[in-house]
Design a protein with these regions (language model features):
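A conserved beta-strand element that flanks and buttresses the S-adenosyl-L-methionine
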Residues: 521
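Conserved class I S-adenosyl-L-methionine
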Residues: 419-452, 472, 550-573
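Class I SAM-dependent methyltransferase SAM/SAH-binding core
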Residues: 466-509
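Phosphate-bearing ligand-interacting subdomains
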Residues: 34-98
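Glycine-rich adenosine-cofactor-binding loop
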Residues: 3-19
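A short glycine-rich, Lys/Arg-flanked "PGG" loop and its adjoining helix->strand segment in the class I
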Residues: 533-545
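Glycan-recognition and catalytic cores of secretory/periplasmic carbohydrate-active enzymes
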Residues: 98-420
Length: 611
């Protein structure tokens, strides 16, 4: 292998270059310390600049020294007319290459959203699958919390209206063909309607029906479900026609019906609802313990059961149950559709990822999530199942010839809970304090002071982390009222200032009504939002007209300057300015916000005045 490189700097930084360039390609080190001449680093000879000067033009020279000496050596080489790169140049190129090689994760999300846009019916409902393109009440129902979570409030409202419009007089809902009522389907619809009811309460969500009418419909639906409950706690659905055989699905999935009833019990102070939930839970835990512990159903339906246990607080039982699928994933690389096959149900795999994320198991969650993402079709959808080419005799018989609507929903949920689990895991690494002289903080403080309203103002820090900015602002701009929102309550627990209101939320689902805040800012958080336009729309929704939205984040032109997360994105200055301009009358950009004493254009500030 030809030796084509010379490293300038025979110290720590010079040695670190060997992470990026094979030693076989390095001719020698060069150093200004003449005492190092004739020594070696990692078996590579070291020469003094004085003795090596005339040969340097024959090689690619890379400067690898601390910032203290970097300018001096650049000047030295420039004077000799010797071209060079720096260690940072090499690092940046390596990170850029790594980013270019990673899967197109953001594209997976964008294609999934395009699939939803293409496969809903007039904005009223989601289809069953591409082979049966009719509205599916059950899935339309449990799409609603997902749409709200990702900031698609109008579509969620439209879905909710359609579901109330088609509710039967007895409170039930029927299947896709409008043939039979189902306890399970009705409960999934209630998940959506309860999510709307809670959003009305928290955010003033605009809905076609009055709160009174919505409350009436929700309670009527729950009363119908509970009318199918036996004294022992069993829920008996009027029809099981769509369930398939007992190997595929059984009534233990009724555990997945209980969460909306729990939420309704709180909303309406219905102790009788909670008492019946407790009885139903105990019945299915006792009657179906073998199926629960030993992966007794199709992974999609099995995951309904285990996620329900997590949501109902039965985490120990859920962890015990997941040992079976954990073992299978270790053996064949993914969770199979059934415990004794080698093909995969895409929805079940995303659901398994969700369960692991909710239990804080990122390792298994990420493995399941990545495998399921790889099954996405170019359309943005997923087939119900995919064959395993290593087992050609096995037939994947779960909707293998159509893209099913529910997989897209569970992909979006898995991505949300992945982000939440990631931030919980990283809690210890977040900054709790910033110097008052940090350029990013100075921009926030200056913009806030410029916009201070007589009598005080409401300020939102969204993606607040440990509240480092708020901590400083309480001292520097004490006349404002501060609110903190973050996806991780674990991270927010570090905010100890009692005057700060804290709520769990995300950039695409901020738990406040329209026009609540005078000044909204987010720093190094938009890069994690995935759906940037949805996040900007939400930032502007909760900010008053003529109020300020401030985004501080990284410039895409500097991509490669540091490692980034799988789902992270940096921003083209004009592109983000254009997105904000849809919701703001004017958007200013500061293209060089300093950080840690450095001003290199990595950070920008976009400042918008809301329409």
């Amino acid at each position: 292998m030809k030796k084509q490189y010379v490293f300038f700097g025979a110290g720590f930084w010079g040695q670190s270059l060997l992470q990026y360039i094979p030693r076989e390609q390095v001719a020698f080190y060069v150093d200004n310390n003449e005492q190092k001449d004739g020594t070696a680093v990692e078996g590579i000879p070291v020469r003094s600049f004085k003795n090596a000067r005339d040969e340097l033009r024959n090689y690619k020279v890379i400067i690898a020294v601390s910032n203290q000496y970097l300018f001096e050596i650049k000047k030295q080489l420039d004077a000799e007319g010797i071209p060079y790169e720096t260690l940072q140049d090499v690092k940046t190129a390596a990170v850029k290459e790594k980013i270019a090689r990673r899967p197109d994760y953001l594209g997976i999300y964008q294609r999934a959203m395009q699939w939803i846009n293409k496969n809903n019916i007039n904005g009223n409902c989601i289809i069953n699958n591409t082979r049966v393109p009719k509205g599916y009440p059950e899935v339309t129902g449990y799409y609603i919390p997902t749409l709200l979570r990702w900031g698609y409030r109008d579509l969620a409202a439209s879905f909710g209206k359609w579901l109330i419009d088609i509710q039967k007089p007895d409170g039930s809902w029927y299947d896709t063909e409008d043939k039979d009522p189902y306890v399970f389907d009705s409960a999934q619809i209630l998940k959506g309607l309860v999510a709307i009811r809670k959003s009305i309460q928290e955010t003033g969500f605009s809905f076609a029906y009055s709160e009174e009418e919505l409350d009436k419909r929700i309670q009527k639906g729950i009363d119908w479900i509970l009318s199918n409950m036996k004294k022992n706690g069993q829920l008996v659905t009027p029809s099981e026609a769509e369930w398939g055989d007992k190997r595929t699905c059984s009534e233990v999935i009724h555990l997945y019906c209980l969460q909306p009833i729990v939420e309704a019990a709180k909303l309406y102070n219905r102790l009788d609802y909670q008492e019946k939930v407790d009885k139903i839970l105990e019945y299915y835990k006792e009657k179906y313990i073998d199926d629960i512990l030993h992966f007794g159903l199709l992974s999609h339906f099995y995951s309904y059961v285990i996620e329900a246990l997590v949501d109902l607080g039965e985490t120990d039982l859920a962890r015990k149950a997941m040992k079976t699928t954990e073992k299978l994933m270790g053996e064949i690389g993914f969770v199979p559709a059934y415990r004794d096959v080698h093909w995969c149900c895409s929805t079940g795999l995303f659901q398994q990822a969700i369960i692991w994320y909710k239990l804080g198991d990122l390792e298994h969650g990420d493995k399941a999530f990545a495998y399921a993402c790889g099954m996405q079709n170019a359309s943005g959808g997923w087939y119900g199942s995919d064959a395993n080419p290593n087992y050609p005799d096995e037939v994947n018989d779960y909707i293998s010839d159509a893209e099913v609507s529910w997989t897209v929903k569970y992909f979006l949920d898995a991505l949300y809970f992945k982000n939440k689990a990631d931030f919980n895991a990283q809690a210890s690494g977040f900054e709790q304090e910033y110097p008052h002289t940090d350029g990013r903080y100075e921009v926030v403080k200056a913009e806030l002071k410029e916009n201070v309203i007589a009598g005080g103002m409401n300020v939102l820090d969204i993606g607040c982390g440990k509240g480092a900015y708020i901590h400083n602002l309480l001292k520097d701009v004490p006349e404002a009222k501060y609110t903190a929102v973050d996806i991780s309550t674990k991270v927010m627990s570090f905010i100890q200032d009692e005057v700060v209101e804290k709520k769990e939320g995300s950039l695409t689902e901020i738990p406040y009504p329209n026009d609540t805040f005078d000044f909204t800012y987010t720093t190094e958080a938009l890069e994690h939002a995935v759906d940037i336009e949805s996040a900007v729309r939400e930032l502007c929704r909760v900010t008053k007209s003529d109020g300020t939205v401030l985004v501080i984040d990284k410039n895409k032109s500097h991509l490669g300057q540091m490692e980034i997360c799988e789902w992270e994105q940096w921003f083209d200055v004009k592109e983000l300015q254009g997105i904000m301009s849809k919701y703001c009358t004017k958007v200013r950009v500061n293209q060089n916000v300093s950080y840690n004493g450095v001003s290199d254009g990595l950070f920008c500030a976009w400042i918008g005045t809301v329409k």
